[in-house]
């Protein structure tokens, strides 16, 4: 569908657009561009369109980490949400609010994307290289979850939120983070 949308924009003489790839795979922006180019080949689309895609459009990689555990199974909670919002959603899901979204691209994107205007400059970052952010995310977030999950599960906890409300589990995780995980990162100590 994306290739079709871009092709229609190209044929209509519209300027290129910015794509923010959010798939949780390495090099997601480059992989998305690769997919579009593969469709250009498969469908025999013209070289002018290929040039438009590769030069006028921007394919940014990004790092978004958001835990989406799945459907809400408690009928009472579903009913409360349906009442609150005024409609029934058969695909109702729950997800944690993510704290940071890192977009890999030219920092000039800050002038085009509306994140600053929305007051999100402390939560959305545009950077030419997101690899340091990925390393931090993988080690800190995934390391913390991996490090405390077994003990938390044995203590009877099923979700991260409940673990963080428990002083013992939260204390263990914080100690592990500060003594074992964060020292392995090339971070500014501030």
Per-range role (PLM):
Residues 1-190:
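Substrate/ligand-engaging "lid" and interaction regions
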């Amino acid at each position: 569908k994306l290739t079709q949308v871009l092709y229609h924009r190209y044929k209509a003489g519209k300027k290129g657009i910015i794509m923010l790839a959010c798939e949780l795979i390495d090099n997601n922006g480059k992989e998305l561009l690769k997919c579009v180019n593969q469709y250009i080949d498969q469908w025999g689309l013209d070289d002018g369109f290929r040039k438009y895609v590769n030069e006028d459009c921007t394919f940014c990689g990004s790092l978004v980490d958001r835990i989406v555990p799945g459907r809400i199974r408690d009928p009472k909670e579903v009913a409360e949400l349906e009442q609150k919002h005024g409609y029934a959603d058969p695909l109702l899901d729950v997800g944690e609010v993510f704290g940071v979204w890192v977009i890999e691209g030219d920092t000039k994107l800050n002038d085009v994307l509306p994140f600053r205007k929305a007051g999100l400059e402390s939560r959305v970052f545009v950077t030419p290289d997101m690899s340091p952010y990925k390393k931090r995310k993988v080690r800190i977030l995934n390391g913390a979850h991996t490090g405390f999950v077994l003990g938390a599960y044995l203590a009877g906890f099923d979700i991260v939120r409940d673990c963080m409300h428990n002083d013992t589990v939260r204390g263990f995780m914080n100690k592990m983070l500060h003594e074992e995980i964060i020292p392995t990162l090339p971070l500014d100590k501030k």
